[in-house]
């Protein structure tokens, strides 16, 4: 396992991005609010990203108890290597996101988190809002399926 202390993005997986370089996948730390609570997220951009492009996007939902720097970040990075703009976020009350009590994992909150990530990424420069996908890992997968049932922006899950 990679040592997160040696990585400015604190990613914990082998092969993780350690710096942004031209011509490679780059990551941008971003934040937005859900009902007044700060949400921490990372946007992964493909090597050929331009803000004037029309890139498909994918929201990546982490497992229960996970954070964006773990497996969700790995999937987000790998998908960006395939040409997608991706967003991996810390759910409300978890990781670097705000909210109390900490470590709460309620289905309604997680579905709202997914929809808010979709709101953010579909407004991101260079993203084609009509080509939005959703990937959920473990518990995030169940929440993703439920969120996609009512949010028709997601064209694939």
Language model features with spans:
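Primarily recognizes the serine-hydrolase "nucleophile elbow" in alpha/beta-hydrolase
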Residues: 116-157
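N-terminal cap/lid segment of alpha/beta-hydrolase-fold proteins
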Residues: 4-53
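The serine-hydrolase catalytic nucleophile loop
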Residues: 65-77, 91
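Alpha/beta-hydrolase active-site loop
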Residues: 71, 104-125
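Conserved dinucleotide-binding and phosphotransfer motif residues
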Residues: 35-37, 82, 124, 150
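Short beta-strand element of the alpha/beta-hydrolase
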Residues: 52-63
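Conserved alpha/beta-hydrolase
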Residues: 78-98
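Glycine-rich "HGGG/HGxG" loop immediately N-terminal to the catalytic nucleophile
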Residues: 70, 93-105
